[in-house]
């Protein structure tokens, strides 16, 4: 026999947690065997855990007197569970298990245990109990009477306990019992069976046949019942096996529940009874005895409702979801940690590179000390360490690239999408600017004539052309980022930076390729072009009060102008696409007047296509937007705007705006009139490299390709000038630029079979383990690179001077000039003689001037002024209107334009743009040609610098060599003779005489640029900066 140790977990709960009932309340318990038992709160027990005298009402505070010769078993400190019965009660054999105070339990098998006093066999079903309490002495008497009864099996059980405590040998988990104690146990079991049989016959218990009634009860016993399954554990004779498994029913709640179909109420709440053990002199280690209850077999578990089944399924699903979420989070954390480690590695690589560069810079700065052996050794050590670092970095990068190939390919697609989205956004912004113009036109929709509908059609053409220009420029900018994958470096080297017209230009091309490229060769093109831009600013006049006579005169002029506009022939000069506008400062005074429209028709006009809302040097965006909003929101805008019929389809471009329109500008209440012309003087091209010998493939690696071409002798010198006239509010840009460009010839991409011979080509190179999708993506990407290579060009500018400049420098031909002046009133004259050793000079050079003055008159010369004057002649062509010749003119314009793709430094032409040139300080003349063109020659004269010297008295002479310093001149341009631009220089010597005309001598000279390599792109750089200033 084994004693099983069991720990009571709920021994510490308070008995006061039992719900209270009123004093005097009674509760009667009944179950199938007609047992009656009552229990009282705060009941104390002996060392065996049993009180035979007192009784406690379940759920109540008051005690109830118990019937004589009744035995009530009250165990200690365990809660109870309720047991439901839904079948007829039948006598059956039960196995009892009781727990000792030493946390050990005894299993009594092969018997039905029953302890009841012989005097307590007949208990009536309807016995009543009165409230009240009994003394402790009565309890002791009852206990002694029951213990003295030899026929009572309780005494035998107690004796067995003492024997077990004295004779058993305990191990860690089990105890062994002697054979004597086993025999005693068997005898007590037989006695208990006899009592059990007698009890059934004497009490005449009537078993109920209705098995559907449900009786639930709970007894506050520290009782653990093993109940065997009747269906599965019976032998052939009907007896149950003792060694097979049993159901365990634990009764550990200190309250009783009786639930019937009529009233289903829970009479008490779960709690525990904790009672301290009371040791006695006789029995120090006595185990707790349990009252035997004859219980029916446990019913089969009822089927679980579908609701609870679903809840269980939901719980399982939620658990799986939580586990999946935890796994996903762990995976994301691991990925994040890997990315963080990768970033740290990259940062370490960058820091190593920076340290390496710093070390090299330190060594390069100490070139004077490299002769020492110690420094050489240190340099070698540093270089070795740096090489090791570079090798380590390369290994790390290779590993990272191998791990992240798939990610990089996906990123390439993402970057392409982002680029396309940016292009779409730029197009939308440009369309917004166009819509602003269309809103102005729609305001006057009621007054627009048929000629204005022609304006809308032309505007659509301008918009489409400009959007094409924007897309092409964005593609060229993005191409440089992607072409780096094919081309490592490319550079054009010229033998000199300064060439003379009629001389050969020599140089070479250095190009290193990362991959093989299938091309037929390389082409070289060079050209010379002239570009002229004139911007005229005119501040609008504020409105003045007019007399009646002036108003009448203005009305007559308006009528004449209206008649002239109606009678204009088709051969009239093309006008700007413009609308009439007044100053925004006068809007308040004229906004409510009704006749202001007629009085403003002769106001100055502005080019609507050249209207710009972007920032400019002369003004700010806020001012411009305010003026535009006032015009747009004014109720009488039809009185301020008048759309003129448009006859041209050209548009201008500028670099001061992010959009593809040149849209200029309210700048500090100024209107801009712009005219520009661009012309190609000479261009040629030839192939410098061919790949016929190599099967049409240019292999990867470094290639050095020499080239040369001849410059014609009649070409003008390089030139770049930018001037601002404050008096006339004009900005003039003029430039003559030489450029060469090299591009690939006949780029082809053809997919070939993946043979062993062709696998060396870059478009067939791939790993054997690579997926088909990756190979397709790679080929598509290479196709896009090939398309970019077709338009890819590398450009370089160079400087050219006219042969006359070099000839004058070599020959040094002197020049002399003499001027004489006489006076009407005074006798005598003044003679001025000037001599120069040579006529060619360069910037920042002192010019020696030999001057002789003979003053034979009675007048004195106050002072002598020497200055350098620049004379610049600009010719512009105005194309006449002719509907039949529009297509021919456009073809001629396309020929004059650059054949290259649009570049940042190249501006598109405005073939039919008019000009507004002031005649206040400049002279202009027009010449008619047979091609229906009107050439306008504009002469611009500016003084670069001047110096003042002492004068000569009357009847005196002066002879000396004066050194004229040119250091004060910020920049000189070469003397040039182009088709649109001509620039010359004169040295002007003036003798100032009071109350008389001055004696003036003008000597033409030549200015050139120094032949240095640094001047290869100086004119092109100035040209680009001047474009931004325009």
From Swiss-Prot:
Residues 547-562 have a biased composition (Basic and acidic residues). Residues 1-27, 119-154, 539-572, 885-931 are annotated as: Disordered. Residues 320-374, 544-577 form a coiled coil. Residues 128-137 have a biased composition (Acidic residues). The keyword Coiled coil applies. One of its GO terms (biological process) is protein transport. GO terms for cellular component: cytoplasm. Residues 142-152, 910-931 have a biased composition (Low complexity). InterPro entries: Arrestin-like_C, Arrestin_C-like, Arrestin_domain-protein, Ig_E-set. Keywords: Coiled coil. Belongs to the arrestin family. This is Arrestin domain-containing protein F. It comes from Dictyostelium discoideum (Social amoeba).
